[in-house]
């Protein structure tokens, strides 16, 4: 019921309750809120138990599709297909986004012929085919 309320929202509600009720009426307000939440929870539990007793085994049959839908909510098609096709093994482990396999930088980088620093006043080599 309250799974979408985070700590920030809860803090805002507490601060708003403190300002609205004031420090002298806040304990009575918190007690009333606790009693109300407990009563609503008891009503919901009673309704569920009454429905379960009236429907009998059909109640579990009605809950099964709802539990299946709850499982689909966190469905990831890519992960499901990978698990189905490769029995949980991911064949793409170690493959980069462009499809190449990563290797050590020394193996993938081309080796320049001469990598010495230029002397003062010396011009860098010029390749007419590269421009």
From Swiss-Prot:
The cellular location(s) given in this protein's UniProt record come to:
Cell membrane
Tell me which Pfam families the record gives: TatA_B_E
Q: Which residues cross the membrane?
A: 2-22
Give the region (Disordered) as residue ranges.
80-131
Instruction: Note the superkingdom of the native organism.
Output: Bacteria
Compositional bias (Low complexity) spans? 102-112
Q: Which UniProt keywords apply?
A: Cell membrane, Membrane, Protein transport, Translocation, Transmembrane, Transmembrane helix, Transport
A single cellular component GO annotation:
TAT protein transport complex
GO term, biological process aspect, one: protein transport by the Tat complex
Name the Gene Ontology molecular function terms of this record: protein transmembrane transporter activity
- Membrane topology per the record? Single-pass membrane protein
Q: How does it assemble?
A: The Tat system comprises two distinct complexes: a TatABC complex, containing multiple copies of TatA, TatB and TatC subunits, and a separate TatA complex, containing only TatA subunits. Substrates initially bind to the TatABC complex, which probably triggers association of the separate TatA complex to form the active translocon.
Query: Which NCBIfam families is this protein grouped with?
Result: tatB
User: What is this protein for, i.e. what is its function?
Assistant: Part of the twin-arginine translocation (Tat) system that transports large folded proteins containing a characteristic twin-arginine motif in their signal peptide across membranes. Together with TatC, TatB is part of a receptor directly interacting with Tat signal peptides. TatB may form an oligomeric binding site that transiently accommodates folded Tat precursor proteins before their translocation.
Describe the family membership recorded for this protein in Swiss-Prot or TrEMBL.
Belongs to the TatB family.
Q: What is this protein called?
A: Sec-independent protein translocase protein TatB
